């Protein structure tokens, strides 16, 4: 499937999506540009699908796309993904996130969007 390069090379694009995906799991909603939100939506749906399987292999696959940092004293990003979010979408077959268009950014009028878990 085609994807947006987001005006970056491969390593920069992977780092950007990794950071955005980690922030989305921690905050459950972020504001970013529309093109970044659309790319992040593809990755987020894949991460939830991996988390629903819940095996060690899928945990390691998901860890490749996330920073496993602490959210609070007892929870990390991977734990939140595999425990809270996976159980929340256990009966859903897809469409775990939604992209809502908002007003353009003030400085350069870039199209902005809110991406959140549905």
UniProtKB/Swiss-Prot annotation:
Record-level Gene Ontology MF annotations: structural constituent of ribosome
GO cellular component: large ribosomal subunit
Sorted UniProt keywords: Ribonucleoprotein, Ribosomal protein
GO-annotated biological processes: translation
Domain of life, per lineage: Bacteria
Transmembrane segments annotated in the record for this chain: none
PANTHER family, per database record: LARGE RIBOSOMAL SUBUNIT PROTEIN BL17M (PTHR14413:SF16), RIBOSOMAL PROTEIN L17 (PTHR14413)
Assembly mode: Part of the 50S ribosomal subunit. Contacts protein L32.
Recorded family membership: Belongs to the bacterial ribosomal protein bL17 family.
Listed name of the protein: Large ribosomal subunit protein bL17
Organism from which the protein derives: Phytoplasma australiense
Lineage of producing organism: Bacteria, Bacillati, Mycoplasmatota, Mollicutes, Acholeplasmatales
């Amino acid at each position: 499937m085609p994807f947006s390069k987001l005006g970056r090379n491969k390593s920069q694009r992977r780092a950007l999506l990794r950071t955005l995906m980690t922030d989305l799991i921690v905050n459950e909603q972020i504001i970013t540009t529309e093109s970044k939100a659309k790319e992040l939506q593809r990755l987020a749906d894949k991460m939830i699908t991996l988390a629903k399987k819940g095996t060690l292999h899928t945990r390691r696959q998901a860890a490749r796309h996330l920073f496993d940092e602490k959210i609070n004293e007892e929870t990390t990003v991977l734990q939140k993904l595999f425990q809270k979010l996976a159980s929340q979408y256990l009966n859903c077959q897809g469409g775990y996130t939604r992209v809502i268009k908002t007003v353009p950014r003030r400085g350069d009028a870039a199209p902005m969007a809110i991406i959140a878990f549905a």
